[in-house]
Amino acid sequence: MLAGMSLHHTRSLAPLTLALLCGLCELPHAAAQPAPRAAAAPNTPADDRMDWWREARFGMFIHWGLYAIPAGEWNGKPVGGVGEWILNSAQIKVADYEPLAAQFNPVDFNAEQWAKAAADAGMKYVVITSKHHDGFCLFDSTHTTWDVADATPFKRDILKELAPAVRAQGMQMCWYHSIMDWHHPDYLPRRSWDPRPELKPDFDRFNAYLESQVTELLTNYGPIGVMWFDGEWENTWTNPRGKRLYDLCRSIQPSVIVNNRVGKGRQGMQGMTADGDHPGDFGTPEQEIPSTGIPGVDWESCMTMNDTWGFKKDDLNWKSTTTLVRNLVDCASKGGNYLLNVGPDARGRIPDASLDRLREI
């Protein structure tokens, strides 16, 4: 058993997944049969906390923020890499990135429509970027003005609108939250093209800011299913800090599930937790699915519909619906979850190509 992962017994498949397994059994190259499971054991409190997630199998990932405005282009030139990394990929200084906030006015955002699209596809939970690596917050935070309520003409708290819409569809609301923060004056390390030494950064102050925002997210928006952390790989973030953050989450909402990116145990993009004393309740393979089942280990593969997470207007490399359904079956048959991403545009619209595939699923 890998450290940081909960031992569990045979999980029941959600009705949607059972239907998919039956419907795809004749497809060529269909997913392998479930791997042998660990022996059944009495439920523990940890198992009870994880039960809904283990039965869910299928969730929606939403990457949305200021990066949807440039949409993969800067100063008239296309920028390589995924859309949400444009500040880093194009080596944009914070002072040049900040004006995007004044342009962010997603008048077509409709929380109910987003939630319905997820529910109609059979998804059981929604994970949205409360804050990505650019530090911009989609919620009204009292600890910064670098957020949608203070820095944009939109002025509305995205999370405050999305959470009740998601719950009204019978799904769990979950937050993605980046530890790495290219914007914050106290975050370290700095980007080489924008060192800003005059700010005299102090990572302990940044850590206090991070914990304060996590407290807001787990206090002001009702019950949260998962805290999905990311950006933990830089050397200023340590395993003791991760344990403290994990404990903070559980102290505010004891039933919340926390992924393994809260600490330092994740082993690259394959996402599973290394041996050792690492915090986190499940592994997070990224853009891949484990080749076999992993008895006794909870995991979730997060994957894109095209080649980017955040909206990128020229990325038209869409996976077929058949491929997406096979991925879902592959994950479910091996005992894992499938977290499928959509990247809304700057007006708040989920791309038609994504909506088409969700309907077809």
Pin down the residues of each PLM region.
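Low-complexity, intrinsically disordered or signal/transmembrane-proximal segments
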Residues: 8-9, 29, 33
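Bacterial N-terminal signal peptides
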Residues: 14-26
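A composition/secondary-structure signal for short, hydrophobic, low-basic-content segments
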Residues: 4-5, 25, 29, 59
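Bacterial N-terminal signal peptides that target proteins for export
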Residues: 2-17
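Mature catalytic domains of secreted/periplasmic carbohydrate-active enzymes
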Residues: 31-361
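Accessible peptide chain termini
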Residues: 1-2, 310
